Design a protein with these regions (language model features):
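Sequence/structural signature of outer-membrane beta-barrel proteins
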Residues: 99, 143, 157-163, 187-189, ...
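Detector for outer-membrane/organellar transmembrane beta-barrel domains
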Residues: 260-378, 383-384
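Surface-exposed extracellular loop regions of Gram-negative outer-membrane beta-barrel proteins
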Residues: 131-153, 253-281, 357, 361-369, ...
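Outer membrane beta-barrel
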Residues: 79-109, 119-235, 254, 258-261, ...
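N-terminal periplasmic/intermembrane-space "pro-region" immediately following the signal or transit peptide
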Residues: 19-100
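Bacterial Sec-dependent N-terminal signal peptides
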Residues: 1-24
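Outer-membrane beta-barrel "beta-signal"
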Residues: 396-398, 421-434
């Protein structure tokens, strides 16, 4: 089949930088004019142009894209009958930072990782730099008389071994309203997370990616609903003496209901139920504990240059799905009053972020979040109780495809015994997308 090469004009893509939020920017890329080049030099009919535009618009629609995800690419290939298109894109991202305080060596700034014992640190300060976050993606979009619209998506980035190894990030297929593959969990809302430079982000962020089967439908009235079954990933604090990990026997079930007013403002209620197992080595029996979580998230524009981001999550047995607690094993904790038994502790997290656009190409944001673990009485005093995180940043889009930014991060960790320590980070970033 003869292929057609498409080039998205840079002048048209400039529309993206005038958007108020990262959601606006990514959607604006879909509205960019496209200059079409057919290798054979043939002209398109109006019907073919309309078909191409419909497919290109489909290319960018995604309910699960966040600020750090790649934007729409400049380059696409399309079949001669305009029924199949393939886009190739990516980004080159460089981050640098300077830590002040007791932060454990890590690319991501997480309050959980603050070193509570000063004797474990030879120096309070640390300089770091990393190309992690650099990535590539491929998306194929097609249309079939029997299947309707379908798409295949593969994304990888250099976050693997030693933070430079290539690692699969997403790989899924969507046919109509059905998605199957390795994709963002239905229990999450990346679009409601504020812009950040640091790889970790807000310490309550739900950011799980897993193998799933999802049905999602958008209604004309602005409502969207989704339900999925997902492969679970759990983290259980077993000791190998009285308790041990047990195999997974039941998938997670997740769902959300969302109402959107306008293309980039919405409120979403998400939920998840799961089964987390462990082995009681004293009685030699396997037990299952019920886990569940709810997430309320929203983003919108109360004023033209202002964007608000907000999330609130609560649950039991869902700590391994993101945020501060993903650094530990808190889906199940040992019951100190009953050896051999475990329980699912409750956890609460919230985040509020504001973004202000000074100019179409310059914007700033500030965010504050907290995560709290509600462990039972008798938990060791050195265990994590809560963490606080705050950041302020400034971004400049030098061109529609080149972005630079600076950021200040602050974090605090408080243990069960009340002992607390803080850390600070100054970071910078420059990235080019294509």
């Amino acid at each position: 089949m003869k292929r057609i090469f498409l080039f998205m004009a840079a002048a048209a893509a400039a529309m993206a930088v005038s958007a108020q939020s990262h959601v606006d920017r990514q959607r604006a890329a879909a509205a960019a004019d496209v200059v079409y080049y057919e290798l054979g030099g043939n002209k398109y009919t109006p019907e073919q142009v309309d078909s191409i535009n419909r497919i290109v618009a489909e290319y960018y629609f995604d309910q699960f894209r966040g600020f750090q995800d790649p934007e729409a690419p400049y380059f696409m290939f399309m079949s001669k009958d305009s029924q199949l298109a393939m886009g190739i894109g990516g980004l080159v991202r460089m981050r640098g930072w300077y830590d002040v305080g007791y932060m454990t060596k890590s690319n991501g700034f997480s309050p959980y990782l603050i070193t509570m014992d000063p004797a474990q640190r030879t120096s309070r300060d640390r300089l770091g730099v990393s190309p992690s976050g650099t990535g590539l993606f491929f998306r194929v979009i097609g249309r079939n008389k029997m299947l309707g619209h379908y798409q295949l998506y593969i994304e990888g980035n250099f976050n693997g071994y030693d933070h430079v190894g290539f690692q699969l990030k997403k790989a899924y297929a969507t046919i109509g309203d059905v998605t199957v593959g390795y994709a963002s969990s239905t229990f999450g809302d990346p679009a409601a997370q504020p812009p950040v430079i640091d790889a970790q982000g807000a310490n309550n962020k739900i950011s799980n990616t897993t193998v799933l089967l999802r049905y999602m439908h958008t209604f004309r009235s602005g409502w969207t609903a989704a339900v999925s079954v997902e492969n679970p990933t759990t983290a259980v604090a077993t000791d190998g003496v009285s308790t041990a990990a047990a195999s997974t026997v039941c998938p997670d079930g997740a769902a959300f209901v969302q109402y959107a007013w306008g293309p980039t403002s919405h409120v979403r209620l998400s939920g998840i139920v799961r089964s987390v197992g462990y082995r009681d080595l004293i009685s030699e029996r396997t037990h299952r504990r019920a886990g569940w979580g709810v997430l309320l998230s929203a983003t919108g524009h109360p004023a033209d240059p202002l964007t608000v981001y907000a999330t609130l999550n609560y649950g039991r047995g869902t700590s391994s799905m993101g945020g501060d607690l993903i650094c530990g094993a808190y889906d199940l904790l040992p019951d100190v009053a009953d050896p051999g038994h475990m329980y699912a502790p409750a956890s609460l997290g919230w985040n509020l972020g504001l973004q202000y656009n000074f100019r179409p190409d310059i914007f700033a944001s500030a965010s504050f979040s907290q995560t709290r673990l509600y462990a039972r009485e008798g938990t060791a005093g050195s265990e994590y109780k809560y963490g606080l995180w705050a950041c302020a940043n400034l971004f400049w889009n030098l061109t529609p495809r080149i972005q630079a930014g600076v950021e200040f991060d602050w974090g605090l960790r408080c243990n069960v015994d009340g002992y607390a320590r803080s850390a600070r980070r100054v970071g910078a970033m420059c990235q080019f997308t294509f």
